[in-house]
Amino acid sequence: MKSNPCPLTHCLFFESPHSLKTPATLEILQLHTSIPRQRARIEQFLAASGLRLDEVDYYAALVDEESGDIIAGGGLWRDIIKCVAVADGHQGEALANTIVSHLIARANAEGHHCVKLYTKPQNRQLFESLSFRLLAEAPQAILMETGVGGIGKYSQALRLISAERQAAAAASATASATLPQAGVIVMNANPFTLGHRRLVEQAAAQVGMLYVVIVKEDCSVFSYAERKDMVSRGVADLANVCVVDGSDYAVSKATFPTYFLKRLSDASDTQMLLDLDLYGRHIAPALGATVRFVGSEPTDALTCRYNKLMQATLPDVRVMQRYEVDGEPVSASRVRMALVKNSLSAAAPLVPPTTLPYLIAHLATRALRTELNTTPKPGLVDSRDNGSHTDMDHAIMMRGIRALHPFFVRLALLGYAPQLPPHGEVVGIGLEAERAMLAATGGVNTHKGALFALGLAVIAAAHAATHATAMGANPPAFLSATIAALAAAFPDTQGTHGSRAKVEASPVATLKSALDNAREGYARLFADWLPFYAARRRANDTYAPHRTLLRIMAELDDTNIVHRSSVDTMIQVKMQARQLLNDFSEPGLEAMNRSFIMRNLSPGGSADMLSMVVFLYGITRQ
């Protein structure tokens, strides 16, 4: 017996068991979807039951030891059971029960104590007999869960928040006043824009209490922690607005996976209806909410369809017109595109001031990725090889960058103030960031120099965002002076590559360390390298970062070169970089890379300055 194709790609096919025994010739095996032949076996098996293979982390199958045939199988993705089927002729043998029990045990072992599953409505009683409880239902599918916590725990947390807010409102109201209705907005805020702010303002004016639920799924450009903090800071002045935690029960990959694919499919309506039913059954009652607010959607087909189903399903849905800037609706995607183009000036008019530190931090992280991905580079890690480094590669460098990002956010928030932050707080965050980087890379120092330089620049950029008038027509000068003021608080260092190189060179030359350059506000960078890079970008030069790196190498006292070789070698490297810049070619860069690898040379200080140039270009370009 075959089921009809299910519109929900991770829907279950399940038959009622009539026996408690499993044939002795069957054993549970793990099949790997990453192995083409095993994946094909799973897909063929599921297709016989009218199902499709969805994303799973683990797939278990009951396999007949004699024939090798899959008799029953099921998958697990995080805490969701998916793609369960029993082969024709084997229904009624309790095989699906065996598979589901195995998957629940697996999920529990991975720390998931509440497990969800999708199935067809006709299987509800069966799963209720197995201790699953209904979460939501749609015409073609239902969502159930079993275990401790789950929707009950989340609903209780929401009820407590609602009770606290109602008590506070009652205490400030007259004795005869009745508390007005509450409303809800569910938003991704990736990032929080002026459009989101306008929606919240308009909604808050229509209800006594407005709850803003942040989509918790961490698959956006901005992390859940960043997005929730962004919204909280962005609505802090609105007394009747409360930002609450999101969950797996509101626009998540568990309830609404196609939302994150941003495309309509035959599964979309079912997922939307399940998500809306979950909201109506559990979230709205827990918050005492009677109104759902959404922004109008003129372009995205999936969101538009979701809004229409919401209006047809929920009792009171109010659609707010999108806020526009320069005749176009403000959207998070416009802001993200500005970041991709490395332009804070294009993003800033679209967001509240409280969002700016998060954008600045992301530009810093993007600058590190741009430097890393600039290929080829002489002696440095790039997307093609490890240069002269035996202890790090592209993947390790990326781990270091990801580890540093939350600290760039903290530094930007620290700098976003009228006064420069205390030196001790700057150092404290920097040391935490360094420890996080080393933990992520297995002890490899991937970005210590870049952390110092970019950390100062991030603080300066965030500080500058609060002094738009003071910056006037010369943002680079303001940024340079701010960086110099921050660096002046750092004492002379001992034991670093830069300090040792200065001592070594002192009989014949005077070198500047990374701290010396910072104390000067990176004067050469602002006067030379940044304008050079900007000119190459305006000329649409695809080799702009490569040429800029060579320009920096030709002028910077790169103490990394001295550390690996000598002052004389550093002088030779400057000459070679200048010659290649004057007669630039990619084969020439590749030849320099081979030479540097043979000589164990790595211009790491120049790479740090390239990251700085890319970042500051994004901050200062108009």
Model-derived features with residue positions:
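Nucleotidyltransferase catalytic core that binds NTPs
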Residues: 119, 124-132, 136-359
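Conserved GNAT acetyl-CoA-binding A-motif
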Residues: 107-119
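Short amphipathic alpha-helix that is part of the acyltransferase structural core
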Residues: 11-14, 21-53, 63, 69
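Conserved beta-hairpin
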Residues: 57-72, 447
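Conserved acetyl-CoA pyrophosphate-binding loop and the N-cap/start of the following alpha-helix
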Residues: 90-102, 195, 199
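Conserved beta-strand in the GNAT
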Residues: 68-85
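Long, hydrophobic/aromatic-enriched structural stretches that serve as scaffold segments
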Residues: 406-463
